[in-house]
A protein has these predicted regions:
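Acidic, histidine-bearing metal-coordination/catalytic regions of metal-dependent phosphoesterases
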Residues: 2-167, 186, 412, 418-422, ...
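Active-site neighborhood of phospho(di)ester-bond hydrolases with catalytic His/Asp-centered motifs
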Residues: 167-169, 192-197, 228-234, 284, ...
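Short, solvent-exposed loop/turn elements at domain surfaces
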Residues: 75-78, 88-91, 101-102, 174-177, ...
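Short, solvent-exposed loop/turn segments at secondary-structure junctions
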Residues: 86, 144, 199, 236-237, ...
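Conserved, compact domain cores that house catalytic/ligand-binding motifs in diverse enzymes
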Residues: 161-231, 236-237
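Alpha-helix termination/capping residues and helix-transition junctions
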Residues: 86, 186, 222-225, 308, ...
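Active-site-proximal segments of metal-dependent phosphoesterases and phosphodiesterases across multiple
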Residues: 309-352
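Extended active-site neighborhood of metal-dependent phosphoesterases/phosphodiesterases
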Residues: 121-128, 132-159, 206, 210-309, ...
């Protein structure tokens, strides 16, 4: 039996290598998809839409429930929610059996104002010391004003820890956004990586903060059951001098408790965490990234901590693309890339996820260290732009021509991606197009880890 098992494992790996060669043969040309999405309304869903999970505020039921990894290594989960009538009900009870809660913790409670808006009571509770690979049941709130959910913790950090990550950005709250979220909840994804531009509340004249409430209601069927890891984009800045609000990222910082301090960062805009077999580093275009800056020095330090024998996958999260052949935001990220690319390539990062451009694009491994504008570099990451979540600004379908040699596949459609990390050497990447309401895999490739393979 051991010999037979070895045979099938060898056969499986051989098939992967063949598929990889077929998908991305050396010197292959990129593809510009000819798919044209059927036009439909891209305006925001009304505040009373059935897509938003809403309760009578006087009942003080927890709403907008969302989970975030709360530490560096995946043994803490932060539970966040909102109540409206009072700050009471600030309890999370949890345990390994349904209706049998062996632990409880009180939440920290905060509020904020923005213009004439006052938020509900925003709760954050850290569930610490959790066992890896374990399903926990939890209840938020008290008595009749409570709700119950469950989540499964990630596997212990290690080189062959398998895990399925979802990736999206620029989501908004249109019918297209709702379809993206609904498709993702059925995809088998276990942790979502969100690379910026969230509610698009700033599309409203007064930066309508109510749209943060509706947006989190839209997501709850996923966010209450698995961690979403957040990266801020330009639509989270929300500081407008004519509104009297000058504090940047106010709603982001109040609502989304990313674990930046756990990685020694002093800002929620850039931080790192480990999950399964991957080491994630989120960096920010919207903070000083110049050589010698606080962010630059932090990134240098964090990259020096990466242990590829423990976390063979090194994945970068950042909102503005460094390689983008769409005419929208074309070359916007070049300045940041020129400063930080040497660090990223020297570290042999595997994948770089970005958003910002409302279309989809995947590149071959490329850098500009030995050329201008991007050429093949096996030490460089695969760049994936996933700013196609569904927001009200719509799609941008104009790409530069001819297609640059670094560009492998590009299409202006709504959708999301999954990264199925199988082991230390192989991950199956799929981009799921929202094909007129159905989830369709439109781009698929095996990504081979260059350090471990």
């Amino acid at each position: 039996m051991p010999a037979l098992k070895f045979f099938f494992e060898a056969l499986f790996l051989a098939a992967i290598f063949i598929l990889q060669a077929l998908c991305e043969p050396q010197g292959s040309k990129g593809v510009t998809s000819r798919f044209v999405r059927k036009l439909q309304d891209s305006g925001d869903l009304p505040e009373t839409s059935e897509w938003f999970i809403t309760f009578d505020a006087t009942l003080n039921l927890p709403e907008q429930v969302h989970l975030t990894q709360g530490d560096y290594i995946g043994q803490t989960t932060t539970v966040s929610w909102v109540t409206w009538a009072s700050s009471s009900g600030n309890i999370v009870q949890y345990g390994k059996s349904k209706d049998s809660y062996t632990s409880s913790i009180q939440s920290d409670v905060t509020t904020y104002t923005y213009g004439d808006y006052t938020s509900g009571f925003i709760h954050h509770a850290k569930l610490e010391g959790l066992d890896y690979g374990t399903t926990y049941f939890y209840k938020v709130g008290d008595g009749s004003s409570s709700r119950e959910f469950s989540f499964t913790t990630p596997p212990e950090v290690g080189p062959d820890a398998a895990h399925v990550f979802g990736i999206t950005a620029d989501l908004g709250q249109t019918i297209n956004s709702a379809q993206t979220v609904a498709h993702y909840t059925r995809s088998g994804g276990q942790t979502m990586l969100f690379v910026g531009d969230m509610s698009y509340a700033d599309r409203y004249k007064s930066n309508s903060q109510v749209r943060w409430d509706t947006w989190l209601r839209l997501l709850e069927n996923s966010t209450a059951f698995q961690s979403w890891m957040w990266v801020a984009g330009d639509h989270e800045i929300e500081a407008k001098s004519n509104s009297g609000e000058t504090e940047k990222f106010k709603a982001f910082n109040k609502r989304f408790p990313v674990p930046y301090q756990a990685s020694g960062s002093t800002s929620s805009l850039y931080y790192a965490f480990k999950r399964a077999s991957a080491h994630f580093i989120a960096i920010s275009y919207y903070d000083d990234y110049s050589e010698g800056s606080t962010q630059y020095q932090w990134l240098q330090t964090e990259l020096s901590k990466v242990d590829r024998s423990t976390t063979p996958w090194l994945i970068i999260l950042e909102h503005v693309p460094w390689y983008n052949s769409n005419t929208h935001h074309y070359q916007q990220g070049d300045g940041m890339r020129s400063v930080l690319e040497p660090l990223i390539v020297n570290a042999k990062a595997d994948i770089f996820f970005a958003g910002h451009v409302h279309a989809y694009e995947r590149t071959f491994r490329a850098s500009s260290l030995n050329c201008s504008g991007g050429c093949s570099d096996e030490n460089a990451p695969v760049y994936i732009n996933i700013g196609d979540g569904g927001n009200s600004e719509g799609l941008v379908g104009s790409f530069v021509s001819p297609q640059p040699s670094y560009s492998a596949f590009r299409e202006a459609s709504y959708g999301f991606a999954t990264l199925d990390i199988r082991n230390r050497t192989h991950a199956l990447y799929n981009w799921h197009r929202n094909d007129d309401g159905d989830a369709v895999v439109a781009d698929s490739t095996w990504i081979i880890n260059r350090v471990s393979s």
